[in-house]
Amino acid sequence: MSSPIVLALEHVSRSYPGGVTALDDVCLTIAAGDLLAIVGPSGSGKSTLLNIMGTLDLPTTGTVRIGGQDVAALSDRRLSALRGRQLGFVFQQFHLTDGLTAAENVATGLLYAGVPRKQRRLRAAEALARVGLAHRMRHQPHQLSGGEKQRVAIARALVHEPALVLADEPTGALDSANGAAVLALLLELHKENTTIAVITHDQDIAARLPRQVSMRDGRIEGSVRR
């Protein structure tokens, strides 16, 4: 039995004024449990694709479906709710809030989900334990290494149990040792059936993931499963 489709892009293009085409007829499906790399050089369209997958931008033409819903048919409010419920984001620069502990930063991922404060704290602690940081819950960002900050960011993306985690260059700001540790964590989360799309320019990272989607000039050049 095939896994349910989490996200589907159907003939998606994105153009900007001046005749710039960032995406050109992109078709892509991500099934539950997938761990894939979307890889390509600078200017290949990866960032635009990330924004459209994350519903932060809409295509000029084509259809984006998340959990079977056409996002273009949703009001801004319903789209925001879908994004907050179905998607988790991990960024290269972590985007943690200074002055908040690791647990408090993770709990912010539940602020708009109507989760009571006590439950937010409990779920934040569980998410941090899941990424190996149960012992750092009370530490603030300036007390954490780069690798630990990225683990906190991953915990924040996971805390509301999204259908899909979008990770934008998650090892890009890290040294090789911390980058390898974060990649190992993503592989471990994949074993737990977390669905993750990693956007990267790094061919070595892409080669270690079970599925690789290659982009160039706004188009998908190929898709390989290992």
Q: Which sequence ranges carry the predicted segments?
A:
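H-loop (His-switch) and adjacent beta-strand-loop-beta switch element
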Residues: 212-224
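ABC family nucleotide-binding domain
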Residues: 4-215
